[in-house]
């Protein structure tokens, strides 16, 4: 019987390979700045979400090492048992200050956050309105919720208005969106969503994973748009992208955060983040709040690469962020393009269905990229352009 089960999986994998949809893991042997080594060969990494390069900042690494010396390597238990430390509390207080909210809770990953917080926030008799291009973790969080789910067209505020105004709801209406869409790099119409929630008495749950540390001088989407923090806005974000470490957080009204502590299953039933991770995230966040040079450098690099893309007339999206996709007509072209970049010393893997509808190379820019790195990327993209 077990052999038959294995055959089922083998056939499924074979089908993925035939369709060029099979994925495999490539592991780094070392990393120095934006230079990585894979199977003995060095590449410039243009596939990292470490937008400010803070994962390798000396103060961030030192903070983690010091925490291990004081608290050990692991959390040991959930926060509701004995897994919490003063470091966890200090990070939550700093994140509350950073996002200008009453309270904050840290969780173990962005995926854990969305699949735990959304079911805790919206349940029976509630209605969720979710952007059609929201991250997989939001989609899965909505599926786990007992609320009714309504999908609106991507970033289409008029479509959402029609939907939200033409449906009756016994409970809460909750609008959920990424702020920056991770595969296209575009920004959601947050100002319009904010005003719509105000008018309709709805909650606004925003996933600012790719906006935190990048937009609004580092403070995220609300600061970027000059919007005030309000009780109806719940701000989720991650510690793993611009902050450069690992984990996630949610900031908002103290009563909502307290409810999450008591009902978000991914928080209640998970061992806490290691103290070293928390200490490193705290050090990183302090750098973002106090030193704006890295953010300035990031945006300078984004402008340089966007100019290269424009001059080469490569097909891209309406990106407004460090995420710069190069689009291709089919999977075969995208795979070939990724190999050309790979052979040129540029690490930028192909993104294929079902992650996205249109195959692409997703280039991400960081403050850690040097002028030489960008020049090397320019040469590789020029070669790419001559072939396609």
Curated annotation (Swiss-Prot):
Pfam families cross-referenced by the UniProt entry: Aminotran_1_2 (PF00155)
One BP annotation, GO: biotin biosynthetic process
GO MF: 8-amino-7-oxononanoate synthase activity; pyridoxal phosphate binding
Quaternary structure note: Homodimer.
NCBIfam families recorded: bioF
Keyword Transferase appears in the UniProt entry: yes
Gene, per the UniProt record: bioF
UniProt entry tagged with the keyword NADP: no
Cofactor: pyridoxal 5'-phosphate
Its EC number(s): 2.3.1.47
Family to which the UniProt record says this protein belongs: Belongs to the class-II pyridoxal-phosphate-dependent aminotransferase family. BioF subfamily.
Modification N6-(pyridoxal phosphate)lysine, positions: 241
The protein's name in its UniProt record: Putative 8-amino-7-oxononanoate synthase
The species this protein was found in: Thermodesulfovibrio yellowstonii (strain ATCC 51303 / DSM 11347 / YP87)
């Amino acid at each position: 019987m077990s052999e038959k089960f294995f055959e089922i999986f083998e056939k499924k994998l074979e089908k993925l390979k035939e369709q060029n949809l099979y994925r495999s893991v490539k592991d780094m042997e070392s990393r120095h700045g934006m230079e990585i080594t894979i199977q003995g060969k060095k590449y410039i990494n243009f596939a990292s979400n470490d937008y400010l390069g803070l994962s390798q900042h000396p103060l961030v690494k030192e903070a983690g090492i010091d925490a291990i010396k004081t608290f050990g390597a692991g959390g040991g238990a959930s926060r509701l048992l004995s897994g919490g430390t003063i470091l966890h509390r200090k990070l939550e207080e700093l994140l509350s200050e950073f996002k200008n909210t009453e309270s904050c809770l840290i969780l173990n990953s962005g995926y854990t956050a969305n699949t735990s917080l959304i079911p805790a926030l919206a349940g029976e008799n509630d209605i969720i309105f979710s952007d059609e291009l929201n991250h997989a973790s939001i989609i899965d969080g909505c599926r786990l919720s007992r609320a009714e789910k309504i999908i609106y067209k991507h970033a289409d505020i008029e479509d959402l208005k029609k939907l939200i105004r033409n449906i009756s709801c016994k409970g809460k209406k909750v609008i959920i969106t990424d702020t920056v869409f991770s595969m296209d790099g575009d920004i959601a119409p947050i100002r319009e969503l904010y005003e719509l929630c105000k008018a309709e008495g709805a909650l606004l749950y925003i996933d600012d994973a790719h906006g935190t540390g990048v937009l609004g001088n580092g403070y995220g989407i609300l600061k970027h748009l000059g919007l005030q923090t309000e009780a109806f806005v719940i701000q989720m974000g991650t510690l793993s992208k611009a902050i450069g470490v690992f984990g996630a957080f949610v900031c908002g009204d103290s009563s909502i955060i307290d409810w999450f502590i008591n009902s978000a299953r991914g928080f209640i039933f998970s061992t806490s983040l290691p103290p070293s991770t928390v200490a490193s995230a705290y050090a990183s966040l302090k750098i973002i709040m106090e030193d704006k040079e890295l953010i300035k450098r990031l945006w300078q690099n984004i402008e340089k690469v966007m100019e290269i893309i424009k001059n080469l007339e490569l097909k891209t999206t309406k990106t407004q962020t460090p995420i710069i996709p190069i689009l291709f007509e089919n999977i075969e072209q995208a795979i070939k393009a990724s190999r050309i970049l790979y052979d040129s010393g540029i690490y930028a893997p192909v993104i294929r269905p079902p992650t996205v509808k249109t195959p692409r190379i997703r280039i991400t820019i960081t403050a850690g990229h040097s002028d030489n790195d960008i020049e090397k990327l320019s040469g590789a993209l020029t070669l790419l352009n001559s072939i396609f």
